From Swiss-Prot:
InterPro entries: QueC (IPR018317), Rossmann-like_a/b/a_fold (IPR014729). Catalyzes the ATP-dependent conversion of 7-carboxy-7-deazaguanine (CDG) to 7-cyano-7-deazaguanine (preQ(0)). Binds 1 zinc ion per subunit. It catalyses: 7-carboxy-7-deazaguanine + NH4(+) + ATP = 7-cyano-7-deazaguanine + ADP + phosphate + H2O + H(+). This is 7-cyano-7-deazaguanine synthase. It is an enzyme of class 6 (ligase). Pathway: Purine metabolism; 7-cyano-7-deazaguanine biosynthesis. PANTHER family: 7-CYANO-7-DEAZAGUANINE SYNTHASE. Keywords: ATP-binding, Ligase, Metal-binding, Nucleotide-binding, Queuosine biosynthesis, Zinc. One of its GO terms (biological process) is queuosine biosynthetic process.
Length: 234
């Protein structure tokens, strides 16, 4: 893993504590960037990922890590923020991609990128890393390339850096990768996947093994030919 120096360029990395965002952090560090991680406590039912994010930030040599609270559960509308909405279990990948799932959190990535943008402006970061990928954007509107390009254009006109001719870049290095491709990349970069938690509905702190996130994670490790270090409840 490359070490950041006092002259290193800064980046903000949105870090959930899951497989994808942790790999994103490793990419930023491998590029020699001074990585400042930002995690968001948005009222998610899987809050255990925040503790994982803290450990991962330390393990991968992040220059800093902040957790910001924005209670999206006040609005509900998602299985991840409303206990009355069941998290889907045992679905095929084709079924996952058929429509926008109930695990979509309204405006979540818009809110998170806005917070990352504010943090980046304050610390003088040039880039924001987000772990969206090919698996996500088939079902989630705020994980698609069009959304990322639109947000980057917004940042150009809505920030001091942008209007002064130094616009921030939105980086999504996993965008064209499958889950297996992400696992291979992260393994090469030394991501401690045993620390990560991708589950939408953990059971006593352990991944449930049956939600969409767990299913895709399992498939990714299997297709990558890498042993999955996750201890699943089922």
């Amino acid at each position: 893993m490359a070490k950041a120096t006092s002259e290193a360029r800064r980046a903000v990395v949105l870090l959930s504590g899951g497989l994808d965002s942790s790999t994103c952090l490793a990419v930023a560090r491998a590029e020699g960037l001074e990585a400042h991680c930002l995690s968001v406590d948005y009222g998610q039912r899987h809050k255990g990922e925040l503790a994982r994010a803290r450990r991962i930030a330390r393990a991968l040599g992040a220059a800093g890590h902040r957790v910001v609270k924005v209670d999206l559960s006040a609005f509900g509308g998602s299985a991840l923020t409303d206990a009355a909405i069941a998290v889907p279990k045992g679905r095929s990948e084709a079924r996952m991609a058929r429509d926008i799932p109930v695990t979509y959190v309204p405006a979540r990535n818009t809110v998170m990128l806005s917070l990352a943008l504010a943090h980046a402006e304050v610390i003088g970061a040039e880039q924001i890393f987000v772990g969206v990928n090919a698996i996500d954007y088939s079902g989630y509107p705020d994980c698609r390339p069009a959304f990322l390009h639109a947000f980057e254009r917004l940042a150009k006109v809505a920030t001091r850096a942008g209007v002064e001719g130094h616009p921030l870049r939105i980086r999504a290095p996993l965008l064209r990768l499958s889950k297996a491709g992400i696992v291979r990349l992260g393994t090469k970069l030394g991501v401690p996947y045993r620390m990560t938690l991708s589950c939408y509905d953990p059971i006593r702190g352990r991944a449930c093994g049956r939600c969409d996130a767990c299913s895709l994670r399992r498939k990714g490790f299997a297709e990558a030919g890498v042993q999955d270090p996750t201890q699943y409840a089922k």
